[in-house]
Amino acid sequence: MTDSLLRRAQHSVAPLQRREIEAALALCALDAVSSVVPTMHLETAVRSGHLSAGLWAVRRRAGLGRELSGVVWNGANFTAILPATDEVMADSQRADVAAGAVSRLARPAAMVGPAEVTLDLWGRVEPWWGPAREFRPRQVSMAIADAPTHVGAVDAEDLGLEAVRRATLDDYDDLLPACVHMFIGEVGYDPMRHGRVAYEDRLRQLVRSGRAFLQYGTVEGRRAVVFKSEIGALGGGVAQLQGVWVHPSLRGRGLARAGLCAVIESTRTTIAPTVSLYVNDFNTPAIAAYEAVGFARVGEFATVMF
């Protein structure tokens, strides 16, 4: 970082301009799965006419001017899309982006994205943004762009399973506890104690937009949510799943695989042709379930939480 501050920067980090949206979308399209979050916000800007303050441009010196060479989303999470043609350019670009992030951006709740870029940037900004509360350097990025592979019948004769469907606001009080349980296990803190209003607003928005799925069944004699998942990001023809969850007392009975098949079919038919997700590399049961229904490994992600 010190070297990047002393030398003349070849790249700048500054708010994205409207005239750059088309070029930014083209950069993101080079890897639509990895770029789904920035793409979502760029597409929102196109539809709404409002350019989010979280969108930042990485510009490279080119003659007397500068040209767009990367895109950064800095909202609750930080994601950098930094295509590079060679190692020298990549190192220069990342050094300048790290310096720009430290000097111009607020520290996010997490850094998330393609592992190579995310880990490189984290190594450069750690003295300023650290320490990390949670470090997940190896996450498997997966995607499916075909019909899912249907698995065998679920061991669920006693569960009174209803069909997997999109949640409505009438389901909200049942869905919320499942989402909170998943969030605590995945992120490590209770969103109802820290940022409750924003968390609930976000969940309601997903429900209203038809991006939350659930399944009811019977648990200990009571009707309850037994499976759920949401589309956390949507852009560039990619729907990124988050929060794939099965009721703890029912795990190992095939509900995740059957539920995922239904979610994939519905999503690919009505929302986006490609469905993606990422998962910790040590979560072998989840990876096995995803591969069983047809997800393929397409890359590696990394997450740094603060």
What do the predicted segments below correspond to?
Residues 1-38, 150-192:
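Short amphipathic alpha-helix that is part of the acyltransferase structural core
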Residues 9, 15-16, 26-32, 40-110, ...:
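Conserved donor-binding loop and adjoining core beta-sheet/short helix segment
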Residues 62-63, 75-160, 304:
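Acyl-donor-binding surface of acyltransferase catalytic domains
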Residues 63-64, 72-77, 187-188, 194-242, ...:
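Acetyl-CoA-dependent GNAT
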Residues 89-100, 242-248, 252-269, 287-292:
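Conserved acetyl-CoA-binding loop-helix of GNAT-fold acetyltransferases
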Residues 105-115, 238, 267-278:
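Conserved GNAT acetyl-CoA-binding A-motif
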Residues 112-118, 248, 277-287, 304-306:
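Conserved beta-strand-loop-alpha-helix junction that forms the acyl-donor binding cleft
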Residues 116-135, 257, 281-299:
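Conserved active-site alpha-helix within GNAT-family acetyltransferase domains
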